[in-house]
A protein has these predicted regions:
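A conserved C-terminal secondary-structure "cap"
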Residues: 2-31, 169-172, 178-258
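Flexible, glycine/proline-enriched loop segments at strand-loop-helix junctions
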Residues: 14-19, 84-92, 143-152
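An anion-binding catalytic pocket shared by soluble metabolic enzymes
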Residues: 22-112, 119-130, 134-136
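Short hydrophobic-aromatic micro-motifs
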Residues: 47, 56-58, 145, 172-173, ...
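Divalent metal-coordination and catalytic microenvironments
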Residues: 47, 101, 115, 161, ...
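Non-catalytic alpha-helical scaffold/packing segments enriched in small hydrophobic residues
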Residues: 100, 121, 144, 156-164, ...
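Class I SAM-dependent methyltransferase SAM-binding "motif I" and its flanking Rossmann-like core
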Residues: 117-157
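A contiguous binding-surface segment within folded domains or other stable secondary-structure elements
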Residues: 144-180
Length: 258
């Protein structure tokens, strides 16, 4: 890889379980680029490495999401130490955010953070996500909020991120962006898909003025929440959407699994 970012094939040096995690995470990076959610070299997605060591995989700082491969991912521990042989750097803000969630949430095997225009726009709206679309109400059931503290370089912020997120699977970081977590790459992508689509719909709808919008009441929000269970989301993601997303990726942006 040009400009100092090397990508040596590591498949033969890691376990089969880690390799599967690497392939899924590289696919998730490329899908993020394919859907237009990337932010040049900024933002990050991580995946816990199966096993007892509490390591996780994250992108090498400086590599575009569309370039990501299974072998190029960096393995770090919860102290921020790189534990595989690589010269790559890790975005320190990315480490703060992702290590916070991985340390606190055993179920958060994958953590995804993006800075889309619409996601940031909604993060800056005092009312947050509104119940104005079916997609929005599905996302709202799992959303928490975290106030902006500046670029996430202070490791002490990890405790506050975790406290604000609680047991939710989605986090809107005020004036900053969005975050999703899940037990798999597919589940995490699907959760982010609903949140980002909801943000786009909201930004467009608000162009008519909030006073002209139909906001669904609490009872209707409860109905939608009951119809969109976490188990249903996982099945929808892992069994139906993710295989299709990989087929799409193989057609349009192959090479992630190297």
């Amino acid at each position: 890889m040009a400009d100092g970012i090397s990508s040596v094939d590591v498949q033969g040096t890691v376990t089969a379980e880690e390799w599967r995690a690497r392939v899924d995470l590289a696919a998730l990076y490329r899908l993020t680029a394919l859907y237009g959610w990337d932010d040049m070299i900024f933002t990050h997605i991580s995946m816990r490495v199966p096993g007892p060591d509490h390591h996780f995989l994250i992108n090498p700082y400086g590599m575009f999401f569309e370039e990501m491969t299974a072998s190029s991912l960096v393995k770090v521990d919860l102290e921020g130490n790189v534990v595989n042989q690589t010269d790559a750097l890790v975005n320190p803000a990315g480490f703060t955010i992702h290590s916070a969630v991985h340390m606190a949430r055993e179920d958060a095997k994958c953590v995804m953070h993006v800075h889309t225009d619409d996601g940031v726009a909604v993060s800056a709206q005092s009312h947050g996500l509104l119940p104005i679309s079916q997609t929005g109400m599905i996302a709202m059931a799992g959303v928490a909020y975290h106030g902006y503290e500046g670029v996430a370089l202070d490791l002490d912020e990890r405790d506050r991120i975790v406290a604000d997120m609680g047991e939710k699977s989605l986090l809107i970081l005020r004036n900053h962006g969005t975050l999703a977590c899940g037990e798999s790459a597919g589940e995490t992508f699907m959760r982010m898909f609903f949140l980002e689509r909801a943000c786009t719909m909201q930004v467009r709808a608000l162009s008519a003025g909030r006073e002209n919008l139909i906001e669904c009441d609490d009872d209707l929000q409860d109905v939608v929440k009951g119809q969109s269970s976490p188990a249903g989301m996982k099945m929808l993601a892992d069994m139906l959407a993710w295989p299709g997303l990989l087929r799409k990726l193989d057609r349009e942006m192959p090479g992630y699994d190297t």
